[in-house]
A protein has these predicted regions:
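PP2C/PPM-type serine/threonine phosphatase catalytic domain
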Residues: 1-175
Length: 175
């Protein structure tokens, strides 16, 4: 039987092949790649996969980042060179170390996390997290917990007001 993790791995590998082939066939697209984050909830478990610096968060009582960025600044945090708080403003914040479509194969990181009714799941691109601190994301989501559409709009608005120049992707789901 196909597991959620194997389903993610197969879907991401298929997407990777498409992007990689496009980049190989069209000189103007050479070197292109993208990030991906996906989630699937089954019973009381969320299965998550990511590549790059798009993130998955769970809001239970507090906002918790589940995924780990595939980025130079994340490696700098892990090695103790910089503090986590410095990631958003670091000059190398946009250098990712793993992407979809840049190599002929790619492997996502996969996570499993327990979820409960009332939890809020957030999947987002770095267009949000480079502009809005986690504490502010948590505040906005908590204040708008009854209206996920409004919460999403407010997160995008906050990123834009902070000077957002990147694409901002936000998916919110309340269980």
């Amino acid at each position: 039987a196909r597991t959620p993790v194997s389903a993610f791995e197969q879907a991401i590998e298929a997407a990777n092949q498409k992007v990689y082939q496009c980049a190989k066939e069209d000189f103007d697209l050479a070197g292109m790649g993208t990030t991906v984050v996906g989630a699937m909830v089954e019973d009381d478990v969320a299965y998550i996969a990511n590549i790059g610096d798009s993130r998955f968060y769970r809001l239970h009582e507090h906002l918790e980042q589940i995924t780990v960025d595939h980025s130079l600044v994340e490696e700098m945090v892990q090695s103790g060179e910089i503090q986590k708080e410095e990631m958003r403003t670091h000059p190398n914040k946009n250098i990712i170390t793993r992407a979809l479509g840049t190599d002929d194969t790619v492997r996502p990181d996969c996570f499993e996390v327990k979820v409960e009714p009332g939890d809020v799941l957030l999947l987002c691109s770095d267009g949000l997290t480079n502009m809005v601190e986690d504490s502010q994301i948590e505040k906005i989501v908590k204040e708008n917990k009854e209206d996920m559409k409004l919460a999403g709009e407010k997160l995008v608005q906050q990123a834009n007001e902070a000077g957002g120049k990147d694409n901002i992707s936000v998916i919110l789901v309340r269980l």
